[in-house]
């Protein structure tokens, strides 16, 4: 009999951002404010603050001591004062942060925020803090009543920054703000569906723009046998072709002439992409990549570095996530294939504990394969595969999802089931259902840009690594290779071609993982980046989700391995930090449709439990948090009704 495994840790591939909590420990307005539903967008300008107190009292004491020293030393010490920044919070959830301005009691930010919100709140809080090496100190806060926000009037002016005693934190201390709330019902962008047609410009406020004239191939699972799925007719009586994902990836890698760039949560060299006896294609991914590198193709692998797997002086630890990252690196060690193991890192200036949390709990979860392909006329173009399938063990599956009958054939050396300690006799394999796609066209170059930004960041040497060879020159310089056409030259599908796709790339990543974001945080807004504490954030995938849900007219369909969010509105554990708006937006969408007496359906498909031991502490914790998403604290009978429907769907 197979045995249950011991409890093991889990790794979340999502972003840690939009997860901050900011509870103001004192009242910022006299009396109690009315709780309102603030659902729409907040357009905010945090302009400047004046006459802030000096919170660096230690440095102030040093300054007093050094004032008796020569003029130059005295002048330097007296310049040390508060390093202020502002957090914006609603219902206890941080929805925005300014950048830090060092050594200023009169900081000028002039920073703009356009934030989607779906919160029950009494006040919008602006909390002014002093950034310190060991954390931050509260200077004071400004509270704007939610009822005043929802009046529709623009709020603009200077507001006293209050301390815990209800008085200004310093005489004359004030914060200059401009706030305009727009309810979701008044936003034209959501009234005509998700968007299509020649006038559609994509999701606004994102890092990558909409790219027109591409071609997309969709895949269900790693492989689809002929005839195993129903025939589907598309518009214009076009026959839909079910794709063969891993076979197409194998062929694309085999036909590459210049580059093969791969990212993954896990990339395992022993995995076989093609099975069922395809002639000449029965080789492992590792052997295939070595062959291509020997042909002169630049092969780069960017793989998440599991902090629990290590290889040092011949001693190896497999790692609790079983990603085989060290084994894959060792396999390619003496080849021309370059492998970078990339850990998740905390932001500059984050505390030691925060950095440990980020490195342990979160992972890099992108899965991309980028190759050059034939573009005709002796030219090459960029093609990218992207989606949910890692090139590792346990991922090869078909829509039939067999549990036992393939254990001696296509899954003979690939029986992975982390529900059990060892896949002994009678142990079924774990089926794996996921989606993937191939992008051919201008958007593929954005996926290439993502890889280059990540590679340049991950390859930057630190500490003793500076003595080793640099990886900076590993990326191909396309301006020196005229054979590879650029994004401006790539041919586009005609607008009226039924196979034409307009594609926009979204992601969740920050400046600790990419190189290329602005050095000056003041430039973040122009690149549609959010500002965290000492970090810039691309949260475009969250922006896209919100836009799609708000614009949906008839239904929402979601498949995901996890479903966590809107913890600021849970009935308990509000401080868990899963502050994305997705569950709340779905609940409000259904409530609005009920009020309008319009039919609407939300289909949310998640596993019975995510990968791992169902009785293990990490899995039970995730299941507990997921249940909280279905019992969001309702306010109003119609919301209670729609949330009850969601609970019914879940169970």
How would you label these PLM feature ranges?
Residues 28-30, 45-78:
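Short amphipathic, basic-aromatic surface patches that mediate peripheral association
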């Amino acid at each position: 009999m197979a045995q249950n495994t011991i409890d093991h840790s889990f790794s979340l591939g999502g972003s840690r951002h939009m997860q901050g909590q900011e509870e103001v420990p004192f009242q910022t307005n006299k009396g109690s404010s009315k709780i309102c539903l603030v659902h729409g967008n907040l357009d905010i300008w945090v302009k400047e603050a004046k006459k802030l107190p000096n919170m660096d009292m230690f440095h102030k004491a040093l300054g007093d001591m050094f004032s008796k020293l020569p003029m130059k030393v005295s002048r330097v010490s007296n310049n040390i004062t508060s390093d202020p920044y502002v957090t914006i919070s609603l219902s206890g959830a941080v929805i925005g942060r300014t950048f830090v301005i060092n050594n200023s009691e009169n900081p000028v930010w002039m920073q703009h925020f356009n934030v989607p919100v779906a919160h029950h709140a009494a006040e919008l809080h602006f909390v002014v803090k002093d950034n310190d090496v060991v954390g931050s100190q509260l200077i004071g806060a400004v509270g704007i009543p939610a009822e005043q926000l929802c009046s529709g009037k623009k709020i603009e002016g200077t507001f006293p920054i209050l301390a815990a005693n209800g008085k200004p934190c310093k005489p004359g201390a004030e914060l200059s703000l401009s706030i305009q709330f727009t309810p979701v019902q008044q936003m034209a962008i959501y009234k005509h569906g998700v968007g299509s047609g020649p006038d559609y410009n994509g999701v606004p406020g994102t890092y990558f723009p909409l790219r027109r004239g591409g071609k997309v191939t969709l895949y269900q699972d790693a492989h689809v046998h002929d005839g195993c799925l129903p025939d589907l007719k598309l518009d214009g009586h076009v026959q839909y072709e079910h794709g063969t994902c891993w076979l197409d990836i194998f062929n694309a890698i085999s036909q590459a002439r210049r580059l093969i760039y791969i990212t993954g949560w896990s990339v395992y060299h022993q995995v076989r992409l093609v099975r069922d006896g395809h002639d000449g294609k029965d080789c492992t991914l590792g052997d295939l990549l070595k062959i291509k590198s020997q042909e002169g193709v630049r092969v780069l692998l960017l793989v998440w570095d599991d902090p629990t797997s290590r290889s040092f002086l011949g001693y190896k630890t497999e790692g609790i996530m079983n990603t085989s990252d060290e084994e894959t690196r060792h396999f390619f060690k003496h080849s021309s294939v370059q492998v970078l193991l990339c850990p998740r890192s905390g932001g500059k200036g984050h505390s030691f504990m925060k950095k440990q949390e980020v490195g342990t709990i979160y992972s890099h979860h992108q899965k991309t394969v980028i190759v050059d392909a034939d573009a005709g006329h002796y030219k090459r173009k960029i093609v990218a595969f992207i989606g949910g399938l890692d090139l590792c063990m346990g991922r090869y599956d078909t829509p039939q999802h067999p549990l036992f009958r393939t254990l001696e054939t296509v899954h003979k050396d690939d029986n992975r089931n982390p529900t059990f300690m060892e896949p002994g006799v009678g142990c079924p394999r774990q089926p794996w259902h996921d989606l993937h796609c191939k992008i051919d066209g201008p958007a593929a170059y954005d996926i290439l840009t993502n890889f280059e930004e990540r590679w340049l960041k991950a390859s930057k040497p630190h500490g003793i690594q500076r003595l080793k060879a640099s990886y900076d020159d590993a990326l191909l310089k396309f301006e020196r290779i005229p054979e590879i056409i650029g994004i401006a030259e790539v041919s586009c599908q005609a607008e009226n071609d039924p196979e034409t796709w307009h594609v926009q790339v979204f992601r969740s990543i920050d400046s600790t993982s990419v190189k290329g974001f602005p050095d000056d945080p003041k430039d973040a807004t122009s690149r549609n980046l959010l500002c965290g504490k000492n970090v810039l954030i691309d949260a475009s995938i969250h922006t896209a989700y919100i836009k799609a849900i708000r614009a949906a007219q008839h239904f929402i369909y979601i498949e995901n391995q996890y479903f966590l969010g809107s913890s600021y509105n849970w009935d308990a554990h509000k401080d868990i930090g899963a502050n994305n708006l997705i569950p709340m937006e779905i609940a409000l969408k259904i409530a609005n449709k009920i009020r309008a007496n319009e039919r609407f359906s939300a289909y949310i498909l998640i596993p019975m439990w995510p990968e791992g031991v169902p009785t293990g502490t990490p899995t039970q914790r995730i299941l507990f948090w997921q249940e909280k998403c279905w019992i969001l604290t309702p306010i109003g009978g119609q919301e209670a009704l729609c949330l009850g429907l969601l609970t019914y769907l879940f169970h």
